[in-house]
Amino acid sequence: KYLRHLLLLHPYTVVIYDELEASEAVRWDWLLHSPTQFQPDKDRNMSVTENTTKGFKTVVRQFSNSSFEYSQTDQFVVPPATPAPAQWHLTATYGPCAQNRILTIIQITPDSEQAPAIVRTGDSFQCDDWSIQAVLSPSQPAELIVTNRTNSALFSYSADNPVIDGSMYLRKSPRSSLLYDQSNGRYGVTEQTDYIPASTRAVDYEHKTNP
């Protein structure tokens, strides 16, 4: 099982929440790619890459109850058939476990600005005006709730029904992903259930056999 929720938080923050489950303890590799080299900092669970040509830098921070190690290479796993620009590939390798949760917060800022600090209290993360609550223990039901302290924006992936503008909003589907945000000057709710990405729908891992 794998589920990924990905959010873009205005103006420059990307949030990725991964739920990973296997039938036995396995190694998990989380990959990120960049045209410029990464500068990993294991003590702070972060990595930085800077594109001086285009004038921006990217700070990647990862949080999990499982320990991991960073590595990187500028080689493709499968060499391209035709010449391609050099790329850097960062891998966060998590030790063997049957279940894992990973919260990744990516901040992309101009070179002239400093990425806001992320303050963690348990499973709560404050990032500038955004409050992120992400359950990282696989023994607890998965949950991702994001709110903003300057407006009414809300994202809720949870078993509970959220409170929107002082009233309880009843989900149409259990554990749906619910977004309350402004569009064309008006706030509204968008609700969606999880689905399997098109790139993996044709793979039946349960019944797949080796040739």
List PLM regions with ranges.
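CBM-like, beta-strand-rich accessory domains located in the C-terminal region of large
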Residues: 1-210
